[in-house]
DNA sequence: GTGCAGACTTGGAAAAATGTTC
DNA sequence: GAACATTTTTCCAAGTCTGCAC
């Protein structure tokens, strides 16, 4: 079902993609064209190459509170008998216990990894006893956490207020830093608490123990002359360094994948805002190059070199289908997912004819986060022929583009345009699509609600292009039904109001006095109001249905140049709060400061 | 080229906050 | 003002891409 829906929406998208593109109007960061008001905060500050700051001062990260042992009444059972666990073993048991209702705990890999790591935390005697997860009973632990969550929900107003104030205090104390003389918000000032690793899809490491991070694991980054953050009492930092070519404040190595995690600034900070702005400027710059790049890769489909042909076909997919680059992954370390360059023969099927089109390529693979990408696309004949060639005498597990890597692809792109990489195409195509869609869908005479539907639809076209999917919300059916009930009720009200208006009209005709006239006017206004409400409700229903399995957030936050949306709001008199929430407006402060209603991507 | 570490962006799910209805 | 629905924010996993060593 989902696949069919996406396919249909994609077909519509392809059609709209045929609309001729308007010539680029190029704006340079800081140029008059793109700016309105001073935007001074967003003038690029002159740091030499690679330097991110002159001054960085902060309080260090906030650590998860120490483990609180379970109360005596909450027991763990093994083979039906209560077993008292050591604190270390109990803590890890609670990580599993609190997840009992979750699907993860039904997965064999998760269970196996958890049990394996749990046993490492046990004392020798515990290990002697606890030998099989199937004989473990965590239900009391689970219930304890469920009750605890429920108790939090029913706290009194005062108690809730107190908790809120405590959180705010924490935010004030650890949530900000000073960067080059300005106070900036930190994105994630809390060190990740210990728990069980929740890898997505068929992740081979799911269920493994994510160790508790101690100050001794943490590297602090701050300026030499600043007040060095105090480690928690009785502890010390792994290292304190002063590296102003990076933006992170603190870092540690996570125990499951052995990768580095960072404390970084919030997206509303100047530093993050500037990089986002730069990213969109690079994508805008691509507008001026894209025609030539397209003609070049088309020419390269006929190259004598296999490597060049593969690169040209891959680039075509990246451009046309907004596929990700697809870096190589170590097998066994993560779920088996692919992007463009790592596609295997088994991920594509060639159809000489399908859906009434010639040369159809069927893609079916798991992309980032194990989200399935399924698409059937008619391609140009040389692409089709090349794919046949690339697949010749290969097994299903072989790489489709065996002569291509993301590094070589990006090296090539860099030669075509300064700063160009595979991902820029995603940004470029997402933003240009939003702009085109808004132009095609918005009508100036529409109501605000209808304009917002148009905006969401434009946003949705982009999300579908980028394959941003979500699980259907669990409450979807029910809430849809509620909405339908509401619509039905409103329809009845409208019918009733219409009848009343008819009666009032007759009454006025008969009486012809001022009183009946004012009644008539009142009835007319009522009908209008109800009709408007009905229209709004049905718009809501349409939007909801179309959005069932599409996630709009990622494209909105990462791929769509906010200046396009802001300009649209200004042009069509839609309050920007209808499009961006408070945090989103803070994140896009740079764009709000500079985009006028005539901004063009 | 290839492998790896590091730094940063992008991603959906889950939790929390807020709004609506009875 | 409780119960439920919806929206917003937080969380942290999973990508991209660069630079360096060999």
Swiss-Prot record:
The record marks 152, 200, 248, 279, 337, 368, 410, 468, 486 as: Interaction with DNA. One of its GO terms (molecular function) is DNA topoisomerase type I (single strand cut, ATP-independent) activity. One of its GO terms (biological process) is DNA replication. Residues 268-601 form the Topo IB-type catalytic domain. Its cofactor is Ca(2+); Mg(2+). Residues 261-262, 324-329, 421-423 are annotated as: Interaction with DNA. The active site is at residue 559. The keyword Isomerase applies. Its EC number is 5.6.2.1. Its main location: mitochondrion. It is found in: Mitochondrion. GO terms for cellular component: chromosome; mitochondrial nucleoid; nucleus. It catalyses: ATP-independent breakage of single-stranded DNA, followed by passage and rejoining. Residues 22-48 are annotated as: Disordered. Divalent metal ions (calcium or magnesium). Keywords: DNA-binding, Isomerase, Mitochondrion, Topoisomerase, Transit peptide. Residues 1-50 form a transit peptide. Releases the supercoiling and torsional tension of DNA introduced during duplication of mitochondrial DNA by transiently cleaving and rejoining one strand of the DNA duplex. Introduces a single-strand break via transesterification at a target site in duplex DNA. The scissile phosphodiester is attacked by the catalytic tyrosine of the enzyme, resulting in the formation of a DNA-(3'-phosphotyrosyl)-enzyme intermediate and the expulsion of a 5'-OH DNA strand. The free DNA strand then rotates around the intact phosphodiester bond on the opposing strand, thus removing DNA supercoils. Belongs to the type IB topoisomerase family. This is DNA topoisomerase I, mitochondrial. It comes from Pan troglodytes.
